[in-house]
Amino acid sequence: MKKLLFKLFFALAFTSISLHGQEKIQQVEFSSFGGRALYSRHYTINFLYKEFEAKQVMGEPAELPKKILQLNPPDKWRVFTKKINLDKFKKLRDGPSEQTVDGQDEVIIIKTDKKTYRKMNAYSNDHDREVWYDLLQIIAKEFGKKGIYE
């Protein structure tokens, strides 16, 4: 009986430790800016809302969707965060700035209950590129788009 209680105690203790150690995603952001782009884009998704904002940087005044703000139902937020592999995102390596050759820099920021992770242009090799573009696809679908560049 003592052995059973001992095993049960340690099983509960290890379960508690492993559940306590998991980070919970609080917010995901994507921004693109710089280069010869006519406007910069910023997407924000959290458990309360989804937001898209475009700011014109240069060129002729254009009709842009300046700001879109939608409520984010809790069930959709749970589905969204389950699609994101935070461990893979943490391992991405920042790439060099694209603005040096008139390109746009892209930044993804994931805020958790414990830490904020920021990655810029993290698509320099095949593995990183796959993780990066998969995450961009997940973000785009939240806004009803086929791709983030649409």
Where would I find each of the regions flagged by the language model?
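A short, structured loop/turn motif at beta-sheet edges
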Residues: F47, Q70-V79, I110-T116
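N-terminal export/targeting and maturation segments
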Residues: L19-Q56
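Bacterial Sec-dependent N-terminal signal peptides
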Residues: M1-K24
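Short, low-complexity, polar/charged sequence segments that are solvent-exposed and flexible
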Residues: N46-F52, L64, P73-P74, K90, ...
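Short, well-ordered, aromatic-rich surface patches in folded extracellular/luminal domains
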Residues: L5, G21-G35, T81, K90-E150
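A short-motif feature that recognizes glycine-rich, charge-decorated loops
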Residues: K55-K90
